[in-house]
Regions:
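Transmembrane beta-barrel architecture of outer membranes
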Residues: 82, 114-120
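Surface-exposed loop/interface segments of Gram-negative outer-membrane beta-barrel transport/assembly proteins
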Residues: 25-68, 108-109, 118, 122-223, ...
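A beta-strand signature from Gram-negative outer-membrane beta-barrel systems
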Residues: 1-32, 80-82, 103-106
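Structured alpha-helical segments in the cores of large, soluble enzyme domains
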Residues: 79, 83-89
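Residue-level signature of outer-membrane beta-barrel architecture
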Residues: 21-23, 89-91, 125-127, 230-232, ...
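Short, solvent-exposed loop/turn segments at the edges of secondary structure
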Residues: 12-14, 116, 281
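Short Gly/Pro-enriched turn/cap motifs at secondary-structure boundaries
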Residues: 74-78
Length: 320
C-alpha cells in the first residue's frame, strides 16, 4: 500500500515482497559446501491401460494374450543434482559474501536436460564511525534448458502417440518397439529420412521418439541483477539514502523440426524457429527520513523521489 510505495516506489503500490540476500558475518570466515540429489519416476503417475484387447485407435479388436507395458518403458528416471558453495568473511568495517550453485537435471523423457548456474556476490561496509553504510550486491544466472517437452496439445506432445498406440501392436502391422527403433526411415523418392508411424501424417499424433529426437529445442536465459545502496546518517534524527538497481534479462530460444514432421505444424522441408529478447529495468531513488521519539510517541517522516526506466527489444524468425 502507500507505506510500501513510499519506501520502494510506485511499483510497490499494491505491496512488496522483500528478498534479503545473505551477507558476511563480523569476525568469522565460513566456507560451506552442500550437495543434494533427487530422483523422479513418472511411471507411478501414468494412466492404467487395458491389455486384453488389441485393435486400432477407434475400437477394440480381438482379444490378445497380453501386451508389453511400453508406456512405462518410454519414461526414464529423472535425476536432479544441486551443488552449492558459499564463502563469507568479515570485519567490523567490511563484510563479504560469495556463493555459487549449479543445478543439473535430466528429465523423465529422453534427451531433456536443465543446466543452471547461479553466482552471488555481496559486499557491505561501514565508514565514518558507522554513519555511512554501503551495500553492494551482484547476482548472475545462466540457465540452459534442452528439449523441454510440450506441456499439452496434440502435435508436439509425445504422450499423445504413446497413449493412443493400439495395445498389442497394430493389427497386421508392427509393434511399438519397432516404431521405437525405427522412428525414421529412408524415403527413396526424397532421398532423406522421414517420420515412421502407423497413422496418417495429419492424425493429431506423431511417433513419440520422432518428437524427442527430431524436434530439438534449446532455451537459454541470462540474467544479471545489480544493487547499490548508500545510507548516511546526518544526525540523530535525519538519514539520507540513495539506492540503485539494474535488472537485465536475455532469453534465446531455438527449435528445429526436421522434414517429416506433421505438416500441420511444419513445412514439407521442416521448420525453424528462433527468438531473442532482451529486457532491462533500471530503478533509482533518493530518500530523506526523519525519526524522533518524544516520550511515548515516535515521529516518522519521509521525503523522496524515485525514477524507473524499462526497455526491451525482441526479434524472431519462423520459417513456417
Amino acid at each position: 500500500g502507500p507505506p510500501a510505495a513510499a519506501l520502494y516506489g510506485s511499483s510497490a503500490a499494491n505491496g512488496v515482497v522483500v528478498i534479503t540476500t545473505k551477507k558476511g558475518k563480523v569476525g568469522r570466515t565460513n566456507i560451506t559446501f552442500s550437495s543434494n540429489t533427487t530422483w523422479e519416476n513418472a511411471a507411478y503417475g501414468i494412466p492404467e491401460f487395458q491389455n486384453s484387447y488389441g485393435g486400432v485407435t477407434s475400437s477394440w479388436g480381438d482379444k490378445i494374450s497380453g501386451s508389453p507395458d511400453y508406456t512405462k518403458d518410454f519414461f526414464q528416471t529423472g535425476v536432479t543434482t544441486i551443488n552449492s558453495l558459499s564463502l563469507s568473511a568479515g570485519s567490523e568495517m567490511m563484510q563479504t559474501y560469495f556463493s555459487y550453485a549449479n543445478t543439473y537435471g535430466t528429465g523423465v523423457i529422453e534427451n531433456g536436460s536443465l543446466n543452471k548456474h547461479n553466482f552471488n556476490f555481496r559486499e557491505t561496509a561501514n565508514f565514518l564511525n558507522n554513519r555511512l553504510t554501503v551495500d553492494a550486491n551482484v547476482s548472475l544466472m545462466f540457465q540452459d534448458v534442452k528439449n523441454r517437452p510440450s506441456p499439452g496439445g496434440f502435435y508436439l506432445n509425445p504422450l499423445t502417440g504413446l497413449y493412443k498406440f493400439p495395445r498389442g501392436g497394430v493389427q497386421g502391422g508392427e509393434s511399438f518397439d519397432y516404431y521405437r527403433t525405427n522412428y525414421k526411415i529412408k524415403n527413396a523418392e526424397r532421398n532423406m529420412y522421414l517420420q515412421n508411424w502407423y497413422t496418417a501424417p495429419t492424425s493429431f499424433e506423431q511417433n513419440p521418439y520422432w518428437l524427442t529426437n527430431m524436434l530439438p529445442n534449446d532455451a537459454k536465459r541470462y540474467r544479471t541483477i545489480a544493487n547499490l545502496s548508500l545510507s548516511f546518517k546526518l544526525n540523530d534524527y535525519f538519514t539520507i539514502q540513495a539506492r540503485g538497481n539494474a535488472d537485465f534479462v536475455s532469453d534465446n530460444y531455438e527449435m528445429k523440426m526436421y522434414a517429416g514432421t506433421d505438416t500441420s505444424i511444419a513445412g514439407t522441408n521442416g521448420r525453424y524457429i528462433t527468438d531473442e529478447s532482451n529486457d532491462l529495468s533500471v530503478y533509482g531513488d533518493l530518500m530523506l527520513t526523519y525519526q524522533q521519539r518524544i516520550k511515548d510517541f515516535t515521529i516518522n517522516a519521509s521525503l523522496g523521489a524515485s525514477i524507473k526506466d524499462d526497455s526491451g527489444k525482441s526479434i524472431g524468425f519462423d520459417s513456417f
